[in-house]
Amino acid sequence: MEQLKQGLSGAQEHVHRAVQSATPIVNDALGKMQHFMAPYILQARSFADNHAAPAMHRVQPFMQQVQARIQKGFQHSTASIDASLHGLQPWQVAAVTAVVVLLTLWALTWLQAAFAEVRETGFVQSLIDFLKTLPGIRGLVKREHTKMMVKLRASINKSLLNGGEQHLQLPKKGLPAQQIISSLEKRGQHDVPFDEGASTVSGTLYLSGEAHCALLNDVYTRFSHTNPMHADVFPSVRQMELEVLAMTAAMVGGGPEGDPEVCGAMTSGGTESILTAVKASRDYMRAKRGIKHPEMVVGQSAHAAFFKAAEYFKVKLVVVPVGKDMRVTAAAVARALTRNTVLVVASSPCFPHGVIDDVEGIAQVASKAGVCCHTDACLGGFVLPFAHKLGYPVPAWDFSVPGVTSMSLDSHKFGMAHKGTSVVLYRSKGIRRYQYTRITDWSGGLYISPGFAGSRSGALISTAWASMIHQGEEGYLRITDQMMKAAGAFAKGLQQIEGLQLAGSPAMTVVAFRASKPRALNIYALNDLMSQRGWHLSALQLPPALHMCFTGQHASIVDSLLKDLQECVDILQKDSTGIKDGMAPIYGLASVSPDRKIIGEFLVAYQDVLLSG
């Protein structure tokens, strides 16, 4: 203790000496500063005396009048209140005051909520919502909604088994296997037929090659009983999942030749991969920077799953417009960033137009701001790496780009596996851990889950593994070259059709197009005419357009597709009204209607019919 006292005494003496030695220096500096500032202070005082004082002298009488009026009004108001409360008991005055305060607070809360609603939905939508509450308009909307439901149900239910066998309750006795197979064959006759290499449907069917399909079916059968949640029971499935993740990471800038820290997890599809990445990024940024009101910046062309994620996870969605080339730029993203931004998104490519956003620029903006950056490669993940190796012009888009923190890519699309598998990758395990769910106080035991699902199909994981092993790099190169050539030939031929033009410059196998003169050619009527000829193109909006996604099943359809497009355009140019029935009126209404809520109600009605018949 004595040593401690001596140490403190010595420290105190050192501090005292330091202060004594510093005091003259500080005083000298202050003196010099005062001497330097003296002329400026004199000038400021002179200006105030010459200009400010006369101005205040002129304003002073006016201010005195204003003050007198305010004082008089205040006195009048207090006198009126005193008169109105005259004769009331103190408790009555207190009660009236409490009621007035509560009513005022209620009114302020209501106004705040109303203004927030207007800010969120926009003034036009808010005005439309108010008009729809008026008695006459409300009844009209209800009647039109009923008519729409009747027509919609009749149109959709055409594809159901009219008069055929249906099972709406469990049969009293189980049916024999042969009868079940026979029933399935009859039901399958209502589906769109597919000929190998000659699909008439945009995207949808990504598997190609009879031998490849047979292999995957066999693999699925062998592992149909497995569940990776029980890794100790099915270690083979765990091993296959690890290998799928490793092979996928190595394709897109991870692995031994890239960033070895890239890691991930398998999901049920692209939407779940996107949802998982958004959830992980939100929670990571909350832990890292304490962001409690998260925002996510996406392009207008970003996949709908990001809109779904924003709704699910209470993340404010900030949508930025695309340029004339349909790409999201770094400048647009930079303008949208705030202190609450947790994630920015770039598409590689975007679903609507097949173009790749400025991933390098967007990732740089995100890195500078210290926020996460996701590149959505659900479509491009199993095409762009091989297109690049084949020599096609592919901008940087994967984990080789600094600042990219997560990625989604679908093994069940161009990875050519069975439907139900996708991959979400992260720059590091430090981000991936935020997609996990861990429960430590459950009576059922300690619980950890890598994603939203508990049980998962080991059979689907095994088919993804088998597909990648069966195709190999050589197989993916061959199929990619075939698809790129088909898409290129279609894009070139499309530009020869008068009345149509490309919507963006396609980066891979998605080719979007629109009318060069929308008033002269209804692109949705064109889609209806093509549907009558058996084609199933994807209809887009904002702006109105169509697209064709080429897969391994479209090797031989380019010429026939271009031929039918040319003939249908010729028909519409002669008769612009097109056909009476079809989706053109609905899509046309959706593209111009300012009432987005009524369009949303139509979509809900459509989904209800699909689920209930």
Briefly describe each language-model feature range:
Residues 2-238, 242-246, 250, 255-257, ...:
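Non-catalytic terminal extensions of PLP-dependent enzymes
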Residues 236-237, 264-271, 298-300, 504, ...:
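Active-site nucleophile and cofactor-binding loops and adjacent substrate-binding regions
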Residues 286-342:
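PLP-dependent aminotransferase-like
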Residues 369, 374, 386-509, 513-519, ...:
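Active-site C-terminal subdomain of aminotransferase-like
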